Amino acid sequence: MRKNIAVCFVVVVLLGVSNLCIPQTVCADSVELGAVRDNTLYEEGNLSNGSGDFFFAGRNGGGSERRALLLFDLGAIPDGATIESVALELTVSQANSLVADVGLHRLLSDWGESTSDANGGEGGGIEAEVGDATWLHSFYPGTLWSNPGGDFDATASATQSVIGPDVYTWQSSGLVADVQSWVDGSVDNFGWALVNDSLVSGSAKRFNSRDNAASPILRVEFSVVPEPSCVALLSVLGCAVVVRRRKAC
């Protein structure tokens, strides 16, 4: 009996060591995600555009500022994944030739998108509906931002120079860090604020929203290390069965 147990122990150890010596293959994968929520904050106050075709960042001709909010559901990325790259693609559908540095800032609190839908080109916004985000409210009419204009990290995670109508991509290590922290659960995912800090009137850029054909796209590349092989575990169970059978005899 002791001899059988000793043999089994040696086999288990050898199999376990060999299993540890087998390199684990890192699986690379990617996802392409559409926004699940977006909106525009209009500096005029209780205006919004939750269900509009566009969102805005920058100042209109009268010098009033707009900021956009974006959120993506990262549920398609598995737990434990290592984020390798992040790229946000946005379509500018209307803008003048002024160069504007538009930054993506990680949002620090939750916010809403409701049924408000501005008229015409949507740059003027419309009266907010219940649950909309506004310049003053994260959720209209009952919940205020801590800071008018939205609660977000003062440091941009990524910045892109935007001129006229075109497709633009934001990509940086800062975006990788944001998505990694959201996937890990170390911070809550409230998305990003799109901020154009230009003080020039008429610097606003109009972007296509998720309700538009050319909607925002978030591309994420990640890697996952598979769970260790079960060969060693099976060998342990097999030996246990052999020992128990022989003991029963």
Regions found by a protein language model. Give the residues of each.
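Bacterial N-terminal signal peptides that target proteins for export
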Residues: M1-V13, P228-S229
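C-terminal segment of classical bacterial N-terminal signal peptides
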Residues: L15-T25
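Flexible, small-residue-rich N-terminal segments that precede or flank a structured functional core
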Residues: Q24-A76, S198, R210-S215
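A short beta-strand element within beta-rich, extracytoplasmic domains
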Residues: F72, T82-Q94, L218
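Beta-strand-rich interaction/scaffold domains
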Residues: A95-S181
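Proprotein-processing/basic-patch segments
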Residues: Q171-S172, V176-V224
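A short, hydrophobic C-terminal helix/tail in secreted or cell-surface proteins
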Residues: P226-R244
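Short, charged juxtamembrane terminal tails flanking transmembrane helices
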Residues: R246-C249
